[in-house]
């Protein structure tokens, strides 16, 4: 019965998510998933503007997340493997997609997506960083992406993704994640 704040993602598999939701429902436990971007001032202001009607009715939403400097760390540790992290769509896009849903006041009911490993598969400098803390290997000056060093020995998740979504309200949305 104690309320639970759970950092996203809810789980990394549908089975895991179903188990968490079922348990919360069966026990009457309040569950809040930590989608923290909706609490950022700029996002709250966007929602206020939309709700005020000043820009008319939302018909489409477009979001391009240029992962850029700093996003590389997802390819230097356990995030780089599908087994442990399932990829950037779950780890990073979850924030952006939550904001898109929140701004549209609607959820996705149709989606088509594709992604590929197109950038970091070209970097040959690999290292096992599992014994290090992130601060020991993170460097904000690693740019461009192909200059990266010490990437995880195994990278089997996409580094580029695109999605098209149709929301319950009829809003069409597109999302792109690139480096």
Language model: regions and residue ranges:
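Histidine- and/or cysteine-centered catalytic micro-motif in compact active-site loops
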Residues: 116, 168, 177-179
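Predominantly a Rossmann-like dinucleotide-binding segment in NAD(P)-dependent oxidoreductases
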Residues: 37-153
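Structural detector of well-ordered beta-strand residues that form the stable sheet scaffold
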Residues: 5, 30-32, 62, 112, ...
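Short, well-ordered coil/turn segments that N-cap beta-strands
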Residues: 2, 29-30, 57-59, 169-171
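Glycine-rich phosphate/pyrophosphate-binding beta-alpha loops
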Residues: 94, 172-179
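Secondary-structure transition into beta-strands, especially the periplasmic turns and strand N-termini
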Residues: 105-107, 168-173
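Active-site beta-strand termini and strand-to-loop segments that position acidic
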Residues: 158, 163-170
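Beta-strand-loop-alpha-helix segment that lines the small-molecule cofactor/substrate pocket
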Residues: 1-38, 53
